[in-house]
Amino acid sequence: MGKSKKNRAAATNQLKHKSQTSAEAFSFGDPVPVLDRRELLDYVECVQTDRWYEPPVSFDGLARTFRAAVHHSSPIAVKCNILTSTYIPHPLLSQQAFSRFVQDYLVFGNAYLEKRTNRFGEVIALEPALAKYTRRGLDLDTYWFVQYGMTTQPYQFTKGSIFHLLEPDINQEIYGLPGYLSAIPSALLNESATLFRRKYYINGSHAGFIMYMTDAAQNQEDVNNLRNAMKSAKGPGNFRNLFMYSPNGKKDGLQIIPLSEVAAKDEFLNIKNVSRDDMMAAHRVPPQMMGIMPNNVRGVWGCGKSEFSVCEERINTLTEKDAGIK
């Protein structure tokens, strides 16, 4: 009997020892950049695929990001429109073709013009090739159009028929990269905030608050009537108010918790404003030219000399680069 008590005491001590040593504190969830793994590709520059080089950044991703946020696509449209307005149409290059050429350059950091000739070797037109699907060959003198489809396969452009305008990169010299890459996370954050708020309003299947009842004076019939009233208040965009009469009820027996207080914690306006400022800093276009209204009533509605000079300097730089077409 004494031996069993000793064993029981030893087992109890062992359980206490395990309970004392099993407690463990650790941290997790440290923020990690989602693009840090891509830095490994900088060691190999552009990846060789089949008969051409792939760009260091996904052009398909840049195309989808173009319309992710209004403050990202608007400055690109401003620059494209200004450059197109300064262009003098040429018999070989129409104004619409030049606009496509400029847009590809601003979005992808690369723009291509294909020289098309007749059977006699005479140039009949200069047509922009879609930068999203144009790749540079392994010898760097040839170009490929790599759009796959039901009836299309990659084909090689005639050697010497492609003019390539690129925005220089610091890691490789095969492709160009746009200057707004640092603002892409802000553009995606801006889009996510807008979609989150939009889903909140579309959902709308609530009465706008939580009713918390602890009053014992209520009978089951009153509770059922209140439940039916809450159910009838549901519906898209239905924010109704309810009235309840509770004689001899407690002060805190019925509590109303508005859902708007919970929704206000997502910092929607701050996220939109901060991400907007990041995109504007990357594109360097005055807010007046992007159609942004000033926050204060006394704000300047027109584009001042300083803002216009900054934009004009940027446009002149792009114009000088496009002059290489001639």
Swiss-Prot record:
Q: Which family does it belong to?
A: Belongs to the phage portal family. PBSX subfamily.
Annotated keywords: Transposable element
| Keyword match Ribonucleoprotein | no
Q: Where is the composition biased (Polar residues)?
A: 10-24
- NCBIfam families per UniProt: portal_PBSX
Q: What InterPro entries does its record include?
A: PBSX_Proteobac, Phage/GTA_portal, Phage_portal_PBSX
Q: Where is this region: Disordered?
A: 1-24
This chain belongs to which protein, by name?
Answer: Protein ORF5 in retron Ec67
